[in-house]
Amino acid sequence: MAEKNSSKKVTTKKPAAHPPAAEMVATAITELKDRNGSSLQAIKKYIATNFDVQMDRQLLFIKRALKSGVEKGKLVQTKGKGASGSFKVNVQAAKAQASEKAKKEKEKAKLLAQREKAKEKGCSEEGETAEGSRPKKVKAAPKKAKKPVKKTTEKKEKKKTPKKAPKKPAAKKSTPKKTPKKAAAKKPKTAKPKKPAXKKAAKSK
C-alpha cells in the first residue's frame, strides 16, 4: 500500500504538459484572428493541434475559461450564450493587462536592482571595516623602529674605539722629552776649551 501511495504522489508532482485552460483559450482566439469572433469548435481544434491535451478532459475547463473570461471582461462574446457562442479578446482589457504586466516587471526589476545595490554596499562596508581593522594590526609593528637603536649602539661602539687610539701617541710624546736632557749635558763639555784661550792671552803678555 505504501508503494502505491508513493507512486500516486510522484504522478501529482509531474509538471503539466500544457498551460492552463485560460491561457490556451486566449492564445487560440488571438491566433485565429477572426473579426466576428472565434467559435468553440475553432478554439477546440486549435488547442488540440497546438497543445498536448486530451480534449475529453479539457473541454469542461475550456468552457469554464470562456465563461470566466467574459465575466472578468477579458473576452467579449459576439454570438450565442454561455460557452456555445463566438468569442473575441477584449482589446482594452488586453492592453490593461499588458500595462499591468509591464509595471509588475518594472517593479520586480527595481527591487532586484535595489537588492543588488544593497548587497554591493554591504560588501563594500565589510571591506571598509576589514581595512579599518587592518591598520590596528599595523600599529603593533613598530618593531622596525628598534633597528635604528642597534645602529646607534654600533655608532657608540665605534666612537669608543677611537678613544683608545689616542692613548698610544701620548706615550710617544713622553719619549722626546727625555732627549733634550741629554743635549743639556753636552753643553758643559763645550765650555772646557774656553779655559786654554785665557792661558794663551797670559802668555802673550
Curated annotation (Swiss-Prot):
Residue span(s) of domain H15: 17-91
Statement: the UniProt record of this protein carries the keyword Zinc: no
Ranges of Basic and acidic residues composition bias in the record: 98-124
Record keyword DNA-binding present: yes
Record's keyword terms, sorted: Chromosome, DNA-binding, Nucleus
SUPFAM superfamilies: Winged helix' DNA-binding domain
Any one annotated GO CC term: nucleosome
Molecular functions (GO terms): double-stranded DNA binding; nucleosomal DNA binding; structural constituent of chromatin
Region Disordered, annotated ranges: 1-21, 94-205
Principal location class: nucleus
Domain of life: Eukaryota
Pfam families documented for this protein: Linker_histone
Localization terms from the record: Nucleus; Chromosome
GO biological process: chromosome condensation; negative regulation of DNA recombination; nucleosome assembly
Bias (Basic residues) ranges: 135-150, 157-205
Role this protein plays: Histones H1 are necessary for the condensation of nucleosome chains into higher-order structures.
UniProt record similarity statement: Belongs to the histone H1/H5 family.
Record protein name field: Histone H1, early embryonic
Native species: Strongylocentrotus purpuratus (Purple sea urchin)
Lineage: Eukaryota, Metazoa, Echinodermata, Eleutherozoa, Echinozoa
